[in-house]
């Protein structure tokens, strides 16, 4: 009996903090983020604005385009030979400035 009472008290003690938060500041269930008091409503132009360089941002887009071009060559080679070749430099006729030949 003493053991059950101890376990019940422990469960209540551990579960009580979960009941303390009433969610009054949540915009929706689970959306409870609030900015700090000095955080601006508009980030652009404030001290929190990261001011990313457009050239740096375009690098990822360029690398994705080059990756897609290599994948086109891999797919073309797979259809042609039936064998997948990861290293595009080993594909006959590979030219990084051109698209693979039309079928």
From Swiss-Prot:
InterPro entries: Meth_DH_bsu, Meth_DH_bsu_sf. GO terms for biological process: methanol oxidation. Keywords: Disulfide bond, Methanol utilization, Oxidoreductase, Periplasm, Signal. It is found in: Periplasm. Pfam families: MDH. GO terms for cellular component: periplasmic space. It catalyses: 2 Fe(III)-[cytochrome cL] + a primary alcohol = 2 Fe(II)-[cytochrome cL] + an aldehyde + 2 H(+). The keyword tRNA-binding does not apply. Residues 1-20 form the signal peptide. It comes from the Bacteria. Disulfide bonds join 26-32. Transmembrane segments: none annotated. One of its GO terms (molecular function) is alcohol dehydrogenase (NAD+) activity. Heterotetramer composed of 2 alpha and 2 beta subunits. This is Methanol dehydrogenase [cytochrome c] subunit 2. It comes from Paracoccus denitrificans.
């Amino acid at each position: 009996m003493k053991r059950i009472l101890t376990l019940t008290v422990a469960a209540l003690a551990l579960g009580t903090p979960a009941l303390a938060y009433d969610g009054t500041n949540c915009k929706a269930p689970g959306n409870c983020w609030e900015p700090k008091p000095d955080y601006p409503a508009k980030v652009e132009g404030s001290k929190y604005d990261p001011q990313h360089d457009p050239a740096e941002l375009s690098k990822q887009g360029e690398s994705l385009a080059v990756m897609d071009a290599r994948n086109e060559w891999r797919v073309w080679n797979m259809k042609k030979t039936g064998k997948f070749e990861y290293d595009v430099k080993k594909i006959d006729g590979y030219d990084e400035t051109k698209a693979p030949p039309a079928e």
